Amino acid sequence: MKGQQKTAETEEGTVQIQEGAVATGEDPTSVAIASIQSAATFPDPNVKYVFRTENGGQVMYRVIQVSEGQLDGQTEGTGAISGYPATQSMTQAVIQGAFTSDDAVDTEGTAAETHYTYFPSTAVGDGAGGTTSGSTAAVVTTQGSEALLGQATPPGTGQFFVMMSPQEVLQGGSQRSIAPRTHPYSPKSEAPRTTRDEKRRAQHNEVERRRRDKINNWIVQLSKIIPDCSMESTKSGQSKGGILSKACDYIQELRQSNHRLSEELQGLDQLQLDNDVLRQQVEDLKNKNLLLRAQLRHHGVEVVIKSDSN
């Protein structure tokens, strides 16, 4: 991105300011250049300038540490001015009132406006008496007698700033306010442990009572089924264990009776089969007897059947 030439009008005449190229990915150590003839070019403190690109985009510039002597307008070349390397990154700081829009150039400046001091490229170096390339210049922003760049940082460290319209610049001094609590915080109130224990105990007692009632009802039903037990004996104080014992005896007796009856049933089935066989034999004998009688009558023999009684 190429810098754009700016013109600043003062009482003494018109001065041309040539801005250099901004750092790109090809040369990460390069810095923004603003080279002029001398620091005395702008004797009028009301002179303003605007950094602006051709397409209205953002402008990247680099902060150079300048000694107090240079800030006070001493002779060029005196004092140490060190540049911060472009490869080091720090926390970005936003300077309030450091940038102005295009419309602000035509307005009258006030005492609180930002003024800029320029130093030639010969005054910029890595140490005392050292110089860098001829296209490098130091740019220091001051407001009154106080520097808006904040506290001075040691040499060898620096940061980059992005120049944009004042509407897009965040106010450095503004802080985000947190809404106060509408009501005092109260920890979650928990019911006493004794109350929970009592509630659980009451529920347990209710369950146990229902279970006992069911058992008592079943025992009463058993006492009605068992022949030896009766309601009178139960009312007289017969224990539940006695009723259960008699119920067990009765169940055993019923099982034995069932087994005996099953055996007798098998014997009856066998007798039934034998009876059927004998009945069939009796029928056969009767039929044979009838045939013999018929033969006797055919031959003229009279058969007299005598009963046992006779």
Curated annotation (Swiss-Prot):
One of its GO terms (cellular component) is nucleoplasm. Keywords: DNA-binding, Isopeptide bond, Nucleus, Transcription, Transcription regulation, Ubl conjugation. SUPFAM superfamilies: HLH, helix-loop-helix DNA-binding domain (SSF47459). Pfam families: HLH (PF00010). Residues 199-254 form the bHLH domain. Residues 190-209 have a biased composition (Basic and acidic residues). Efficient DNA binding requires dimerization with another bHLH protein. Binds DNA as a homodimer or a heterodimer (USF1/USF2). This is Upstream stimulatory factor 1. It comes from Bos taurus.
